[in-house]
Each structure stands twice: as structure tokens, then as C-alpha cells.
């Protein structure tokens, strides 16, 4: 397959598409820029990123890791993109957070040593239908409305609501096939690299091939079970 044929394969991908996002997010600079915007913390540091297809992914298929970021303050942040609205999203977030927490814990750990985890759930629709681009879901004491810190932060952000904020502008980029926005240089440059430069196009095609092989294998296994 020529470079031009490969470019043709990846040209229609957008950041909201999970396969493209996974490759896009396999870059510390992109994730740091994204989380600084979504979590509104200009000093936030991303030290490492693990994606689903990475050999360093020790979580297996039990949890979806579009991008698991290890932050400078020791917290972990699992970022997931979701286009389909045919799921129970809150339970999905709860399940994935639980798997990550258990996987990163030892049986003799004290509970105070349980990891602090942030979940950022990016969707193509407004989950709560309250016309907000971002929602922070907290645990609270019902009787007093006081927030309880149990080490889990849940942030839901979407591409559907346009409210003129920087977060909304950034989220709108997730719907574009091509991005050229000086406010978001890391995202802009990474998308260009993956779509127009040989190294990036090859990287994208390799991941696509991996998923194609997995889908074929799963289909064969399912066929054997039926047979």
C-alpha cells in the first residue's frame, strides 16, 4: 500500500473516533494540553500515558483504556471517548474506575493507599441533557450536601454543547477531520502528523491493522463456539 493510499484510509478520522483518539493520545504533550483545558489546571503535568494497544497495558480487555495518564501529583486519569449513546454511561465509568483501582492495589494495602483516580469521559452527546459542556459528578452527603472526597473524580465533557468557552472550543476540534487552531498547538500538530506525515500515517495504520486482526480472531473464536 502506497503512502497516498494509507493517507486515504485515515483522512476521515476525527479525534472523537476511539481508534484515532487512542493513537492521538499516545503522546504526553497532547494529553497534558487536553487535561489542562478540561480540568482547568494550567500547571497540571502528565508524566506518562498508557493506551489500549500499548504493550505496557496490564489491564487487558477488562477495561477500556483510550488513554490512562499518570499525573505529576501521583494521581491517575483515565480518559475515554464515547460516540455511541447506547450504554449506561455512569455504570460504565464506575466499572472501569473499579477495575483500574483494583488492578493498581495490593491485597495488603491499607485503604488510605488506594489510588486517587480521575475519570474524564468525552462524549459526542450531552449525557445529562442540561445544556452544559462539562459536568463534575461528586459524592455528597445527602443530608448536608457536603462533598465527600473518596479519591474518585468524575468529569463528563461533550462535543454537543457550544457555549463559547475554551473547553467548548477545544471539544469542537474533536469533531473536525483537520485541525488548525493556534490555541491548541499540541492537538493541531499531532493530528497533522498522523494524517499527513509518513511516520504518523504508518503509526495509525499499524493500530488499525491490530484491531482488524483482533476482530477477525474474535469472529473465528465465536464461530468455533457456535459450531
Predicted regions and their residues:
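Short, charged alpha-helical interaction segments and adjacent helix-coil junctions
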Residues: 1-11, 15, 19, 77-82, ...
Amino acid at each position: 500500500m502506497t503512502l497516498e493510499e494509507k493517507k486515504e484510509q485515515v483522512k476521515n478520522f476525527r479525534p472523537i473516533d476511539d481508534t484515532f483518539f487512542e493513537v492521538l493520545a499516545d503522546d504526553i504533550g497532547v494529553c497534558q494540553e487536553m487535561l489542562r483545558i478540561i480540568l482547568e489546571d494550567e500547571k497540571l503535568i502528565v508524566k506518562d500515558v498508557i493506551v489500549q494497544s500499548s504493550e505496557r497495558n496490564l489491564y487487558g480487555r477488562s477495561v477500556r483504556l483510550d488513554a490512562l495518564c499518570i499525573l505529576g501529583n501521583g494521581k491517575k486519569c483515565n480518559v475515554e471517548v464515547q460516540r455511541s449513546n447506547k450504554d449506561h454511561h455512569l455504570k460504565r465509568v464506575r466499572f472501569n474506575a473499579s477495575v483500574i483501582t483494583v488492578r493498581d492495589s495490593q491485597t495488603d494495602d491499607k485503604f488510605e493507599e488506594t489510588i486517587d483516580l480521575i475519570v474524564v469521559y468525552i462524549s459526542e452527546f450531552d449525557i445529562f441533557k442540561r445544556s452544559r459542556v462539562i459536568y463534575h459528578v461528586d459524592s455528597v452527603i445527602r443530608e448536608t450536601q457536603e462533598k465527600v472526597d473518596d479519591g474518585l473524580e468524575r468529569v463528563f465533557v461533550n462535543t454537543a454543547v457550544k457555549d463559547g468557552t475554551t473547553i467548548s472550543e477545544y471539544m469542537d476540534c474533536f469533531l473536525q477531520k483537520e485541525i488548525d487552531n493556534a490555541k491548541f498547538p499540541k492537538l493541531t500538530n499531532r493530528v497533522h502528523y498522523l494524517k499527513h506525515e509518513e511516520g504518523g500515517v504508518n503509526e495509525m495504520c499499524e493500530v488499525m491493522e491490530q484491531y482488524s486482526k483482533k476482530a477477525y480472531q474474535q469472529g473465528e473464536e465465536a464461530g468455533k463456539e457456535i459450531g
